[in-house]
Swiss-Prot record:
The keyword Ribonucleoprotein belongs to this UniProt entry's keyword annotation: yes
PROSITE patterns according to UniProt: RIBOSOMAL_L5
Protein name: Large ribosomal subunit protein uL5
Subunit structure: Part of the 50S ribosomal subunit; part of the 5S rRNA/L5/L18/L25 subcomplex. Contacts the 5S rRNA and the P site tRNA. Forms a bridge to the 30S subunit in the 70S ribosome.
Coiled-coil ranges per UniProt: none
The species this protein was found in: Burkholderia thailandensis (strain ATCC 700388 / DSM 13276 / CCUG 48851 / CIP 106301 / E264)
């Protein structure tokens, strides 16, 4: 069992039951999945960009990402339908908790001028989104072997009904909120 998964069962669940007064353990919000998405508009000109991004995401997530393709053509961006324009990977279960552990304890502290993550990035339904500007904050990425700095979006989906419940859940996982 992953370290954060054990931590969730032993510390987070009792803490949230006490804070919100849930009657059942099944009412306690939990993280269902974490989605990592990398949009690669520059992949239209160079096909190597997709390969390098897929390699980076594989190292970060520990599983192979899916290459996302354009749904429709956009002449202004020189994109045709079916062109590869991004990569995404969905993590669940053990891999999700392992990634969350690495992200909170190792990757976030490596961000330059880090003062905490925004507490306003919730969507109103208990899900949280974080934008990472550089993939080099992850220790799996070798700085000397990357071709370009790429950002990625990390979307954390929870079963929480409100943003307050989701924020309490993530805060109990030691998420460094600044507000």
């Amino acid at each position: 069992m992953a370290r954060f998964q054990e931590f969730y069962k032993e510390k987070v669940v009792p803490g949230l039951i006490e804070k919100f007064g849930y009657k059942s353990v099944m009412e306690v919000p939990r993280i269902t999945k974490i989605t990592l998405n990398m949009g690669l508009g520059e992949a239209v000109a160079d096909k190597k960009v997709i390969e390098n991004a897929v390699g980076d995401l594989t190292k970060i997530a520990g599983q192979k990402p899916v290459v996302t393709k354009a749904r429709k053509a956009i002449a202004g961006f020189k994109i045709r339908q079916g062109y590869p324009i991004g990569a995404m990977v969905t993590l669940r279960g053990r891999a999700m908790y392992e990634f969350l552990d690495r992200f909170v304890t190792v990757a976030l502290p490596r961000v330059r001028d880090f003062r905490g993550v925004s507490g306003r990035a919730f969507d109103g339904r208990g899900n949280y989104n974080i934008g990472v500007k550089e993939q080099i904050i992850f220790p799996e990425i070798d700085y000397d072997k990357i071709d370009a700095l790429r950002g990625l979006n990390i979307s954390i989906t929870t079963t929480a009904k409100t943003d307050d419940e989701a924020k309490a859940l993530l805060a109990s996982f030691k998420f460094p909120f600044r507000n």
